[in-house]
């Protein structure tokens, strides 16, 4: 049986994480609307958006370019829950700076929704689950915040920070799965795939393009 593993995300961090775990996915960015719905909490939001992203790719017809006996589509969505406030991607330097002034010296919960869809012979099986990791931030000085924001790294990442880049020095403690902080929990993903009858180790070391046999 040939398998095509699709990452429905343009996140470099998620791609690096999968590659480090021995999986070489096909990357198909989702065009889903990632707007936050009124009254939606972090768990509901990331669950909905991860599913929406996966189905956006599935329904786009893009998978037809990668024929395989079994198609696996993985989509994720991450936000930082800071005292009940949902922080996605700041997009602007000023917003990232404002967020960091609230975040420094405090804890937040990085919430990542994961959606896995497995398609075999036209039959779709899928599952959505949530990963949550408590992150403690260092008490940064104003100068450190300015320098970090000026680096450009915070603008395009959930919660305006990374753990695997410049922001790693500003994380003093993690309670939970550290992979989840990068936007994709490998232990959670493994369990989801097992629930859908996919053996994790069967996905290792696929040739470029995400096809395995």
Curated annotation (Swiss-Prot):
The keyword Cytoplasm applies. The active site is at 77 (proton acceptor). Its cofactor is a divalent metal cation. The keyword Glycoprotein does not apply. It comes from the Bacteria. GO terms for molecular function: nucleoside triphosphate diphosphatase activity. Gene3D superfamilies: 3.90.950.10. GO terms for cellular component: cytoplasm. GO terms for biological process: nucleotide metabolic process. Its EC number is 3.6.1.9. Belongs to the Maf family. Nucleoside triphosphate pyrophosphatase. May have a dual role in cell division arrest and in preventing the incorporation of modified nucleotides into cellular nucleic acids. This is Nucleoside triphosphate pyrophosphatase.
């Amino acid at each position: 049986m040939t398998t095509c593993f699709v990452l429905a995300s343009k996140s470099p961090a998620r791609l690096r994480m999968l590659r480090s775990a021995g999986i070489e996915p096909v990357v198909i960015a989702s065009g889903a609307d990632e707007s936050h719905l009124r009254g939606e909490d972090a768990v509901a939001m990331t669950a909905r958006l991860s599913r929406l992203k996966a189905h956006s790719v599935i329904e786009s017809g893009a998978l037809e370019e990668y024929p395989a006996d079994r198609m696996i589509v993985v989509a994720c969505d991450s936000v930082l829950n800071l005292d009940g406030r949902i922080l996605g991607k700041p997009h602007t330097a000023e917003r990232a700076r404002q967020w960091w002034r609230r975040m420094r010296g405090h804890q937040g919960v990085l919430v990542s929704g994961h959606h896995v869809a497995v398609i075999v012979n036209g039959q779709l099986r899928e599952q959505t689950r949530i990963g949550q990791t408590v992150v403690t931030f260092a008490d940064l000085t104003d100068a450190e915040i300015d320098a970090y924001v000026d680096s450009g790294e915070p603008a395009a990442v959930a919660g305006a920070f990374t753990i695997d880049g410049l922001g790693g020095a500003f994380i003093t403690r993690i309670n939970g799965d550290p992979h989840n902080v990068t936007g994709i929990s490998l232990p959670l993903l493994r369990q989801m795939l097992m629930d859908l009858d996919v053996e994790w180790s069967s996905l290792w070391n696929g040739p470029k393009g995400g096809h395995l046999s």
